[in-house]
């Protein structure tokens, strides 16, 4: 069973033993057909930077402990998220030990697929969606769940 494709090896003596880097097979499956056609693969992009919600961050925001999502930290100017009026964090809150971003939208799901981390958000976009496609985001804004449509764009180079 193929799990990845070797792409590079770091070695001290020029041999094939050392630290290897591989492209995951799901990534290759998504990209290779486009490349075979002689086309450039356009990664779908929503135009945010975000952060995972830790247990303490959720507590500081007064969210349920079992609620997962990605807090939008920053919205890229002119990007899809800005066009869809998504909001990055506005202020910080403290739990007497740490400060946490607050006031930003929290992405809960993409087309009903739950999102619990930035890594998962990237994977869901990459494996299931294309640039130019419109997706439906479930967002938590000011403790209220709302739906926001967003048209994916190609990730800037």
Enumerate the predicted regions with their spans.
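Active-site loop architecture of trypsin-fold serine endopeptidases
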Residues: 1-36
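C-terminal recognition in membrane/secretory proteostasis and scaffolding
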Residues: 14, 27-157
């Amino acid at each position: 069973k193929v799990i990845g494709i070797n792409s590079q090896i770091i070695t001290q003596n020029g041999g094939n033993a050392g630290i290897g880097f591989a492209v995951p097979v799901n990534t290759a499956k998504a990209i290779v057909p486009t490349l075979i056609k002689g086309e450039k693969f356009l990664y779908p992009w929503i135009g945010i930077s975000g952060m995972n919600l830790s247990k303490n961050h959720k507590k500081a925001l007064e969210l349920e402990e079992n609620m997962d999502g990605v807090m939008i930290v920053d919205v890229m100017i002119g990007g899809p998220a800005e066009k869809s009026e998504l909001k990055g964090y506005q202020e910080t809150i403290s739990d007497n030990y740490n400060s946490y971003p607050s006031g930003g939208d929290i992405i809960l799901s993409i087309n009903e697929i739950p999102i619990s981390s930035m890594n998962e958000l990237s994977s869901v976009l990459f494996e299931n969606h294309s640039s130019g496609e419109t997706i439906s985001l479930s967002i938590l804004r000011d403790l209220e769940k709302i739906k926001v449509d967003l048209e994916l764009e190609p990730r800037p180079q």
